[in-house]
């Protein structure tokens, strides 16, 4: 027997997840899971990576989100100002894309959450969820959900009100989650309500790391993120220095600290592990496992576009357009006395255009050139060139950079290597006070435009300093 992990946080859940999508997929293969969901907090950033890896390893990807739900996204008051409405501030809820339409709606919900709904966290409300419900599967989520919060306060009428809304809105695509780390009485209430409302129950591990080997790293990241304070007047006894890492953290921050993962098994549990944990709570129902498989079976494949497929099509033959522009520019620059020799430039241009043509990158160069030409025409300051793109003669001839790569001995292969399968990255410095004008132009010109986030990883020296801070080791000792 197996089940499917439907509540999974990767390292894209910043400071709240440790494992990579690949580590989770490898674990799913090891456990015999036919499918696996990704439900990072407030972000869809891990979707493409998990999808690609899951498909390569014959695991069905289920793309989702653990979102933050509120009563009204226009209400941006602090909790202290809400007078008893605190249960409707940042409520967790799991959304899973059932099909391509569901994935499109999931993206739309996320977009609204990060723009109109953002208040410390990306939020959406009941009205938005109802508007974009098509193709969405909803599960009730963790102890921070509206449902569990109501049960914890013994507000049973409120819990039933929420359940009725979700069932009326999503029908059979709404599921109630039970978890091994829920309080036993909460799981009991959830199952009773599910039976009363004829809603299917699924068991979920609410994973934040892939296995127990990552538990210490998870706790370190949590302490960093919550800016935990060492207990006052504590002295670091010699005996504590030789204890386990988790014991040392308990010693420094207290076993009963408000936020900790140390008390829970929140890794991707095997079927036997999760079944054993639920049986300890007196829950022995096979349907909570089989329902995860049934849910996964309802999920259809998605049409995930590759990077090149997303580029706008404005030319019937972008390769020819790029060749025409660069050759015309080369002819114009032949009058410059600094040229090393026309044959050298023509040979280099042929080589670059050939690689760009083989890689199908021409539309990207044309888009960047169009953007920079417009900015310069509007007297917006643009940098002369930065990064590896300065090694491209094509970029120079298009006016993307102002640096002659041959004159300075710069290599094109640092920019685009034909043996690598990555996408070129043209770094462009634009006058910061007028950058929004350029973005607005791109939207007008190409319609479908998105900002891109960059995820930075902990580096060696930074990791040492952060670990030392968590372990209350003076930086003077670290710097020795």
Residue ranges and their predicted role:
Residues 1-4, 147-148, 194-196, 276-386:
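Non-catalytic structural connector segments
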Residues 2-35, 41-197, 215-224, 231, ...:
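Extended substrate/RNA-proximal surfaces in nucleic-acid metabolism proteins
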Residues 38-44, 177-184, 209, 310-315, ...:
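Conserved short loop/turn motifs at secondary-structure junctions
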Residues 40, 61, 99, 138, ...:
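A residue-level signal for conserved active-site and pocket-lining positions in enzyme catalytic cores
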Residues 102, 141, 202-210, 380-402, ...:
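Conserved phosphate/anionic-ligand binding catalytic regions in large, soluble enzymes, centered on
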Residues 217-323:
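Active-site or pore-adjacent capping/gating segments
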Residues 274, 278, 415-451:
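A structural-propensity feature for long, helix-poor, extended segments
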Residues 395-422:
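Class I SAM-dependent methyltransferase SAM-binding "motif I" and its flanking Rossmann-like core
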């Amino acid at each position: 027997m197996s089940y499917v992990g439907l509540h999974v946080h990767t390292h894209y859940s910043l400071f709240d997840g440790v494992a990579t999508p690949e580590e989770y997929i490898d674990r799913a293969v090891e456990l015999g899971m036919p499918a696996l969901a990704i439900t990072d907090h407030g972000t869809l950033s891990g979707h493409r990576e998990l999808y690609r890896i899951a498909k390569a390893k014959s695991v069905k990807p289920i793309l989702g989100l653990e979102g933050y739900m509120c009563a009204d996204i226009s209400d941006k008051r602090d909790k202290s100002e809400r007078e008893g409405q605190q249960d409707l501030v940042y409520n967790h809820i799991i959304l899973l894309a059932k099909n391509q339409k569901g994935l499109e709606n999931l993206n739309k919900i996320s977009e609204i959450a990060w723009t109109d709904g953002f208040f410390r966290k990306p939020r959406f409300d009941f009205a938005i969820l109802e508007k974009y419900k098509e193709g969405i599967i909803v599960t009730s989520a963790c102890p921070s959900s509206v449902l569990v919060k109501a049960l914890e306060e013994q507000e049973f009428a409120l819990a039933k009100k929420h359940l009725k809304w979700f069932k009326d809105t999503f029908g059979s695509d709404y599921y109630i989650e039970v978890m091994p780390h829920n309080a036993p009485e909460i799981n009991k209430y959830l199952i009773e309500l599910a039976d009363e409302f004829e809603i299917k129950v699924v068991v979920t591990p609410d994973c934040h790391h892939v296995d127990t080997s990552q538990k210490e790293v998870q706790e370190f990241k949590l302490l960093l993120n919550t800016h935990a304070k060492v207990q006052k007047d504590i002295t670091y006894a010699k005996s504590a220095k030789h204890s386990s890492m988790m014991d040392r953290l308990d010693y420094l921050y207290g076993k009963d600290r408000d936020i900790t993962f140390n008390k829970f098994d929140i890794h991707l549990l095997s079927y036997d592990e999760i079944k054993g944990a639920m049986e300890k709570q007196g829950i022995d129902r096979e349907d909570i496992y089989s329902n995860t498989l049934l849910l996964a079976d309802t999920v259809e494949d998605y049409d995930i576009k590759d990077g090149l497929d997303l580029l706008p099509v404005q030319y019937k033959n972008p390769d020819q357009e790029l060749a025409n522009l660069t050759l015309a520019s080369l002819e114009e620059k032949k009058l410059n006395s600094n040229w090393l020799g026309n044959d050298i430039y023509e040979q280099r241009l042929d080589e670059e255009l050939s690689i760009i043509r083989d890689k199908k990158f021409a539309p990207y160069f044309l888009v960047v050139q169009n953007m920079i030409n417009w900015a310069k025409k509007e007297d917006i300051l643009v940098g002369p060139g930065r990064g590896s793109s300065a090694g491209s003669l094509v970029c120079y001839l298009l006016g993307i950079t102002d640096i002659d790569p041959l004159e300075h001995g710069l290599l094109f292969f640092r920019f685009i290597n034909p043996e690598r399968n990555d996408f070129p990255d043209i770094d462009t410095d634009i006058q910061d006070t007028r950058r929004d004008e350029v973005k607005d132009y791109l939207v007008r010109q190409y319609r479908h435009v998105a900002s891109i986030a960059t995820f930075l990883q902990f580096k060696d020296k930074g990791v040492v300093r952060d670990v030392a801070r968590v372990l209350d080791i003076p930086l003077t000792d670290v710097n020795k």
